[in-house]
């Protein structure tokens, strides 16, 4: 059985150990500082004698350090395992933040936690509610950051299953036998096998990032620690850049963007009207029934009333086509669809689609078929 040294010394970054087994999947050690995946927290990564391992997993009573190349190791070797501490500490902060948020949700707002996920960018907490007002979640953000500033102690207690059940925890206990209780002093108490910071102050900050519905429940989204700081800074840079781009004060960016969007809508309508007028004039001029158009094919649709037309237009590097005519005549084109590289269809008298051929080649080929 691997000695779980990460429980004894959560802040230990390196330790010596003996290799107990070597497998194609990785190494087993006599003891480790590397936390294995569990409880929504990903496994640690790092180096064993300078050789990187990418993950840490529970394998029964043993802990596997996932490694691509184990050829230099053998059972009995004494090795030094070193954590990717930045990665580990990031998830210690995030896991502690999750306990803090879930505890405050339950104690202050009566909201239970169903599941959690600690990702590379965000922390998510699925709640037992089908609806939560936005101002409740913003208040929760304030409460969490207040608790961070207060620096509540975080510590562990080991006790029997029956003792733990008598504590009235906010979630049921999922393990048999003795239970490890994580306590955020004055805030939360829960059974958990994860690794946490020693104080809420080490979380740094918590930022509410939104919510979404999943399985009929509200899932809340958060950023913590360095992630929250990085997002705050990137948002500030974005606002500053938009302010310069729109020549507007930071508090006027939204209004400036709305004006720009409205101008863009008006320009699109003006352009659409001009294209349709150009298409109308082109058709009225007695043009060839097969031609390449400078206007989008949609501009012709309001003006096609009679006759037969095959029109092409290239947009975004693709040859679009429009055929106005009878079902029987379109059947001639469909018969040669492979040769024409045609895709699309429709219903008489209007058919349209795209072709892999250039406009010039497509028009020449269609002219031969429909002549």
Question: Which ranges hold each PLM region?
Answer:
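A glycine- and charged-residue-rich anion-binding loop/surface
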Residues: 1-371
């Amino acid at each position: 059985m691997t000695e779980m040294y990460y429980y004894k010394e959560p802040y230990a970054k390196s330790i010596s150990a003996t290799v107990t087994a070597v497998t194609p999947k990785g190494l087993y050690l006599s003891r480790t500082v590397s936390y294995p995946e569990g409880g929504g927290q990903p496994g640690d990564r790092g180096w064993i004698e300078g050789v990187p391992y990418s993950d840490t997993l529970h394998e029964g009573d043993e802990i596997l350090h996932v490694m691509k190349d184990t050829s230099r190791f053998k059972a009995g070797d004494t090795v030094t395992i070193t954590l990717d501490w930045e990665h580990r500490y990031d998830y210690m902060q995030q896991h502690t933040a999750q306990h803090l948020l879930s505890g405050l949700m339950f104690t202050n707002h009566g909201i239970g936690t169903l599941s959690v996920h600690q990702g590379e960018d965000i922390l998510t907490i699925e709640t037992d509610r089908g609806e939560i007002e936005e101002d409740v979640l913003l208040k929760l953000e304030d409460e969490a950051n207040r608790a961070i500033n207060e620096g509540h102690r975080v510590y562990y207690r080991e006790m029997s299953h029956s003792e733990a059940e008598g504590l009235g925890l906010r979630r049921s206990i999922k393990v048999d036998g003795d239970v490890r209780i994580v306590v955020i002093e004055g805030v939360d108490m829960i059974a958990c096998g994860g690794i946490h910071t020693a104080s809420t102050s080490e979380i740094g900050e918590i930022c509410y990032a939104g919510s979404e519905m999943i399985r009929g429940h509200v899932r809340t989204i958060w950023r913590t620690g360095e992630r929250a700081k990085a997002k705050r800074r990137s948002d500030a840079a974005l606002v500053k850049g938009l302010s310069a781009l729109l020549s507007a004060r930071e508090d006027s960016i939204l209004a400036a963007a709305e004006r720009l969007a409205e101008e863009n809508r008006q320009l699109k309508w003006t352009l659409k009207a001009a294209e349709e007028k150009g298409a109308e004039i082109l058709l009225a001029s007695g043009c060839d029934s097969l031609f390449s158009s400078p206007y989008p094919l949609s501009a012709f649709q309001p003006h096609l009333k009679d006759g037969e037309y095959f029109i092409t237009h290239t947009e975004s590097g693709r040859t679009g086509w429009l055929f106005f005519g009878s079902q029987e005549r379109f059947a001639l084109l469909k018969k040669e669809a492979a040769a024409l590289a045609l895709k699309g269809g429709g219903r008489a008298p209007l058919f349209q689609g795209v072709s892999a051929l250039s406009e010039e080649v497509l028009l020449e080929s269609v002219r031969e078929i429909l002549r």
